[in-house]
């Protein structure tokens, strides 16, 4: 069961996030919560870390997320947060 929270008028974005994780999902990673706020935009909480996507979700962000997850999986890295809100790239936080 995935909890979806926030002032969401259109379910297209949360459904795209769920679809992305269903296609990509390695066995040990699963969605727990999807939140939208006007301040931070979309936040995804998994069993391992938090992902901040920003206010808009597009194919470029999802491809960047997939590349980042592939890199982390290949290198056995587990950040506490992946932040894709910056146009210049991805920020990883390894602190708790």
Where are the regions that the model predicts?
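Charged, solvent-exposed interaction patches on well-folded alpha/beta domains
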Residues: 1-96
């Amino acid at each position: 069961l995935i909890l979806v929270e926030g002032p969401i008028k259109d379910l297209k974005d949360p459904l795209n996030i769920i679809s992305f994780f269903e296609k990509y999902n390695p066995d040990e990673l699963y969605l727990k919560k999807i939140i939208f706020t006007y301040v931070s935009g979309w936040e995804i909480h998994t069993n391992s870390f938090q992902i901040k996507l920003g206010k808009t979700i597009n194919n470029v962000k999802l491809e960047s997320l997939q590349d980042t997850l592939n890199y982390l999986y290949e290198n056995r890295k587990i950040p506490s947060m992946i932040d894709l809100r910056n146009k210049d790239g991805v920020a990883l936080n390894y602190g708790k």
